[in-house]
Swiss-Prot record:
<feature type="transmembrane region" description="Helical">
    <location>
        <begin position="208"/>
        <end position="228"/>
    </location>
</feature>
<protein>
    <recommendedName>
        <fullName>Membrane protein</fullName>
    </recommendedName>
</protein>
<feature type="repeat" description="1">
    <location>
        <begin position="9"/>
        <end position="11"/>
    </location>
</feature>
<feature type="repeat" description="4">
    <location>
        <begin position="18"/>
        <end position="20"/>
    </location>
</feature>
<keyword id="KW-1003">Cell membrane</keyword>
<keyword id="KW-0677">Repeat</keyword>
<dbReference type="InterPro" id="IPR030676">
    <property type="entry name" value="CitT-rel"/>
</dbReference>
<dbReference type="GO" id="GO:1905039">
    <property type="term" value="P:carboxylic acid transmembrane transport"/>
</dbReference>
<dbReference type="InterPro" id="IPR001898">
    <property type="entry name" value="SLC13A/DASS"/>
</dbReference>
<feature type="repeat" description="2">
    <location>
        <begin position="12"/>
        <end position="14"/>
    </location>
</feature>
<dbReference type="GO" id="GO:0005886">
    <property type="term" value="C:plasma membrane"/>
</dbReference>
<keyword id="KW-1133">Transmembrane helix</keyword>
<feature type="transmembrane region" description="Helical">
    <location>
        <begin position="332"/>
        <end position="352"/>
    </location>
</feature>
<feature type="transmembrane region" description="Helical">
    <location>
        <begin position="254"/>
        <end position="274"/>
    </location>
</feature>
<feature type="transmembrane region" description="Helical">
    <location>
        <begin position="32"/>
        <end position="52"/>
    </location>
</feature>
<dbReference type="GO" id="GO:0008514">
    <property type="term" value="F:organic anion transmembrane transporter activity"/>
</dbReference>
<feature type="region of interest" description="4 X 3 AA tandem repeats of P-S-A">
    <location>
        <begin position="9"/>
        <end position="20"/>
    </location>
</feature>
Length: 513
């Protein structure tokens, strides 16, 4: 590279050839504004730090609870992006825990190096590896267009009357939940297809038909986040916490057997609620079937990359479903092998550069720090202390497993109203709830109860802000928040009642309660 720092002044350049510095100057700097939520988060941090140290709580534990309070306020208020909050949490853990005495020997401090290692420990968790692989496979689906083909084939097979369109929308979300391990990616795939169908029908964007279709996309996506383990990041985070904190994990098939029946029942409930509360202006939509066939014909025959991706996806489903039955390969390992095949020269479907451009790396950062936060809460005894505090002052110990589940799941559903990310909610609260379960006496199945509480984390049905897929659908301007809540409130109430019914019967028969 030529060094120009000591060059003599040159003649003025022509106006048609502006200098690199001038070209750079025209790029406006990003405008950063302070959000009130950041001040509230810092205040929460300082308040918890200033409280006299409670009996039984370590110094490091109190500081971790202060960091947890900071994280919850930042995530609820969305004062900064989730990625920025993850870096903030990492720095706070390194600084505050680094100068705290260790749990085992209070005369020795953790040191910033060890504390930073605690803050980054989540990045070595197998759950993070699985999320990364899942995001890469989602990118492959988008690159090849296989997700779009699956959606159109499903709609074509079911039909395009208003009644069948709703059934088809739910069927599409179920099919994609099996092969696209990202709720946001699934909704982003289905939304343009359904908007094309709505446009082909010639119905108004503000009609009940359009609103019903788009709300169904969002709500069915959340419902099937419960049914399939690999359908959402928060599920994988839940499994990661099980493995790290309880020493056990739920297989893909075990999750499916437990969650899919509830999701099927709620899909039926959703269908009838949309039909009842957003009645379609007409039952017959001329040109609907032709519109779907036209879209499908435009895709042409199935391409070679689509066939290879379909084969790998089916292979992954087979291996996920037979883990512990026919083989001992865990879900993350199998998924990574599938990913290697998809990136192999000649037989793969995408290269690293393409995958890099289409992967939401911020999700992985938040996920890794979330696991670190939960693990550090327990390694500093903060989680155990808080769990004991909750059990002692709430009277949970006097109740049976069903009532404990009813109380804790209701708490998660209500607190979710303040969170825009189920992953953030899981990272903040699930380790504490696991600590509560560990503190409870009796023979409660703590792994099973953790899975069931993980189900309720996906209850983002009431407000559009409660889940990214809701916001994707809201962006179509086919419905407003009031219409969304009109469907979402009864879905939440019935879904919670169904959770309790399943906990008292089916899940108890399976041994999870």
């Amino acid at each position: 590279m030529t060094d120009t720092s000591a060059s003599p002044p040159s003649a003025p350049s022509a106006p048609s050839a502006p200098s690199a510095a001038a070209a750079q100057a025209v790029v406006p700097a990003p405008k950063l504004t302070l959000h009130w939520g950041l001040f509230a988060a810092v205040a929460a941090l300082l308040v918890v730090l200033a409280i006299p140290q409670p009996e039984g709580l370590t110094v490091a534990g109190q500081r971790m609870l202060a960091i947890l309070a900071f994280a919850i306020v930042v995530w609820i208020t969305e004062a900064v992006s989730y990625e920025t909050s993850a870096i903030m949490i990492t720095s706070l853990m390194a600084g505050l825990i680094g100068f705290a005495p260790t749990v085992n020997d209070p005369s020795v401090q953790y040191g910033t190096s060890k504390a930073l290692g605690m803050a980054l420990a989540g990045f070595s968790n197998t759950a993070l590896a699985l999320v990364a692989a899942a995001l890469f496979i989602s990118a492959a689906m988008t690159v090849t267009g296989l997700d779009r083909r699956i959606a159109l084939v499903t709609l074509s097979a079911i039909g395009t009357s208003t009644r069948r369109i709703l059934i088809g929308t739910i069927a599409v979300t179920i099919a994609l939940s099996l092969v696209v391990p990202s709720a946001t990616a699934r909704s982003a795939c289905v939304v343009p297809i359904m908007m094309g169908v709505i446009a082909a029908f010639g119905v108004d964007k503000k009609s009940n038909i359009a609103a019903g279709i788009m709300i169904t996309v969002a709500q069915a996506t959340s419902i099937w986040n419960v049914g399939i383990q690999t359908a959402a990041a928060q599920n994988l985070l839940t499994v990661g916490f099980m493995d790290k904190l309880l020493g056990e994990r739920i297989t893909w098939l075990q999750w499916l057997i437990a969650g899919a029946p509830w999701a099927i029942a709620m899909s039926v409930v959703l269908y009838f609620l949309v039909r009842l509360l957003l009645p379609a202006e007409t039952d017959a939509i001329p040109g609907g079937k032709e519109a779907v066939q036209r879209e499908l014909s435009a895709l042409g025959p199935m391409s070679a990359p689509q066939k290879r991706l379909a084969a790998v996806s089916l292979g992954l489903l087979l291996f996920w479903a037979t883990e512990g039955k026919l083989h001992s390969f865990d879900t993350a390992t199998v998924t990574f092998v599938g990913l290697v095949i998809l990136m192999m020269p000649r037989i793969g479907v995408m290269d690293w550069k393409t995958m890099q451009q289409r992967t939401p790396w911020g999700t992985l950062i938040v996920f890794g720090v979330g696991i670190s936060l939960g693990t550090a809460l327990l390694s500093t005894n903060a989680g155990q202390w808080l769990g004991q505090f909750v059990v002692t002052h709430s009277g949970l110990a006097a109740h049976g497993a069903l009532l404990v589940f009813a109380i804790l799941s209701a708490f998660l559903i209500l607190i979710h109203l303040g969170f825009a990310s189920a992953t953030a909610l899981t990272a903040a609260l699930l380790p504490i709830l696991i600590a509560v379960l560990q503190t409870l006496p009796g023979d409660i199945n703590r792994v099973g109860m953790t899975m069931l509480l993980g189900f309720t984390v996906s209850f983002g049905f009431i407000l559009p802000i409660n889940a990214p897929q809701n916001m994707v659908c809201l962006g179509t301007e086919t419905f407003n928040g009031r219409q969304f809540a009109r469907i979402g409130i009864p879905v939440t109430i019935i879904g919670y009642a169904m959770m309790l019914l399943f906990a008292a019967t089916y899940w108890r028969w399976l041994g999870w309660v």
